[in-house]
Swiss-Prot record:
Pfam families the record matches: YabA (PF06156)
Domain of life of the source: Bacteria
Protein source organism: Streptococcus mutans serotype c (strain ATCC 700610 / UA159)
Details of cofactor binding: Binds 1 zinc ion per subunit.
Amino-acid positions noted as binding Zn(2+) in the UniProt annotation, renumbered to this chain: 84, 86, 100, 103
Function: Involved in control of chromosome replication initiation. Inhibits the cooperative binding of DnaA to the oriC region, thus negatively regulating initiation of chromosome replication. Inhibits the ability of DnaA-ATP to form a helix on DNA; does not disassemble preformed DnaA-DNA helices. Decreases the residence time of DnaA on the chromosome at its binding sites (oriC, replication forks and promoter-binding sites). Tethers DnaA to the replication machinery via the DNA polymerase beta sliding clamp subunit (dnaN).
GO biological process, one term: DNA replication
Name of the protein in question: Replication initiation control protein YabA
InterPro entries reported in the protein's UniProt record: YabA
Cofactor requirements of the protein: Zn(2+)
Quaternary data: Homotetramer. Interacts with both DnaA and DnaN, acting as a bridge between these two proteins.
Gene that specifies this protein: yabA
Main localization of the protein described in the UniProt heading: cytoplasm
Length: 110
């Protein structure tokens, strides 16, 4: 193997290392994004669980008609916080706080 061939081999090896490094950086970024998204979803989930617990306690303590209006008010608060309250997407964050026809039907039906 002459010097030129040896140089070409090292050059190819160097290029492969650079490509592998770029792929590793891309994977690292993806993992970081997923970890951030997971943390955000965990916070949302905890918040929704707290609200659900609060609603359950309210329901057990006051089953009168006042509790019904209180439940509706709580659903409105959840909806205003940017979460779906409909059966199709319950607990999911609304995209760009756009109105959901299913949620609106739940809020405003008589």
């Amino acid at each position: 193997m002459d010097k030129k061939d040896l140089f070409d081999v090292f050059d190819g090896f160097s290029q492969n290392l650079m490509e592998t490094l770029a792929e590793a950086e891309a994977l690292k970024k993806q993992v970081q994004d997923l970890v951030e998204q997971n943390a955000s979803l965990r916070l949302e989930n905890d918040k929704l669980r707290d609200r659900l617990s609060h609603f359950s306690q309210m329901e057990e303590s006051d089953p009168s008609s006042k509790a019904i209006s209180s439940r509706k008010e709580n659903l409105e608060n959840i909806y205003e916080d940017g979460f779906h309250i409909c059966t199709f997407f319950y607990g999911q964050r609304r995209e760009n706080n756009e109105d959901c026809a299913f949620c609106m039907e739940l809020l405003y039906r008589e």
